[in-house]
């Protein structure tokens, strides 16, 4: 039986992650409160942030920026959108 969580982002009960995707306290919070579906949404957003902002993940500042964005995405006021980004219409 799959582990379920009350997803903080989707505001519903959903399948939980199989393991903590990030170290430390933030990783523990994500494991306990974020669903697989929400994590996949974050990965897409993270990829967009890396590409549009031309982040070099070998740079510690870029990794710190992404960690802050991840925390804001799930537990804060939401992550940054790249400059000029217009969400697609359905």
Curated annotation (Swiss-Prot):
Cellular component GO terms held in the UniProt record: cytosol
Domain of life of the native organism: Bacteria
Keywords annotated in UniProt: Iron
Cited InterPro entries: Fe_traffick_prot_YggX (IPR007457), Fe_traffick_prot_YggX_sf (IPR036766)
Keyword Transferase among record annotations: no
Iron among keywords: yes
Any single GO BP term: cellular response to oxidative stress
Single GO MF annotation: iron ion binding
One matching Pfam family: Iron_traffic
PANTHER family from the UniProt entry: FE(2+)-TRAFFICKING PROTEIN-RELATED
Similarity section: Belongs to the Fe(2+)-trafficking protein family.
Primary role: Could be a mediator in iron transactions between iron acquisition and iron-requiring processes, such as synthesis and/or repair of Fe-S clusters in biosynthetic enzymes.
Name listed for the protein in its UniProt record: Probable Fe(2+)-trafficking protein
């Amino acid at each position: 039986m799959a582990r379920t969580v009350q997803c903080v982002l989707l505001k519903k009960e959903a399948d939980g992650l199989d393991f903590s995707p990030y170290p430390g306290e933030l990783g523990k919070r994500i494991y306990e409160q974020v669903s697989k579906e929400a994590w996949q949404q974050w990965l897409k957003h993270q990829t967009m942030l890396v590409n549009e902002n031309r982040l070099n993940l070998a740079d510690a500042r870029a990794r710190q920026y992404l960690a802050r964005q991840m925390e804001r995405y799930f537990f804060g006021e939401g992550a940054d959108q790249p400059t000029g980004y217009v969400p697609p219409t359905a």
